[in-house]
Regions:
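Capsid-like jelly-roll
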Residues: 1-165
């Protein structure tokens, strides 16, 4: 489990993309010394509101999250996010401060060809731990509040290794 990032919102909305990979894990090289291959099975993502904006009349932020497994481009507009079929909204509140989602990220066999999605069960050589696995994109809508909200994004990567050295 590790922190993917902390988002501070102040008076603007913003898109985010989160590619995952073995190289993001602390001390991943320990596994590289022990095994020949790996594959990412699942990523559990926890999006939590650490600090709400402290103005009593301001609204809580809404996170619009969706699965996109062909690139790591950041969504540029809220409308582009809302056009996605699988988008899921989550509005934080005093009672709902955490949004959790589990994804199965994908990677491309050829990074220049978006049609080259690798099969989910395909093993990757340990010599390439920085292969990007695409999956989660989101838009944070802070309703143009002039007060800050802090949102943390944490991930737990579930992976398998094969062929002990």
């Amino acid at each position: 489990s590790f922190s993917v990032g902390v988002l501070t919102r102040a008076a603007s909305d913003m898109g985010h993309a989160f590619p995952f990979g073995l190289s993001l894990l602390p001390n991943y090289s320990e596994f590289a010394n022990l095994f020949d291959r790996y594959r990412l099975r699942r990523v559990d993502v926890r999006i939590a509101m650490v600090q709400k904006n402290n103005h009593t009349t301001s609204r809580f932020p809404t996170v619009w999250a969706y699965m996109d497994d062909d690139d790591a481009s950041i969504p540029l507009t809220k409308n582009a996010v809302l056009e996605r079929q699988s988008v899921r909204p989550f509005t934080f509140s005093d009672a709902k401060t955490v949004y959790s989602v589990s994804i199965q990220p994908r990677w491309l066999l050829d990074s220049t060809n978006k049609a080259s999605l690798a099969p989910r069960d395909m093993w990757i050589d340990m010599s390439t731990p920085s292969v990007s696995h695409y999956g989660l994109k989101m838009w944070v809508d802070d309703y143009n509040s002039s007060y800050d909200s802090i949102i943390s994004v944490d991930a737990t990567i579930h992976f398998e290794c094969q062929c002990v050295r």
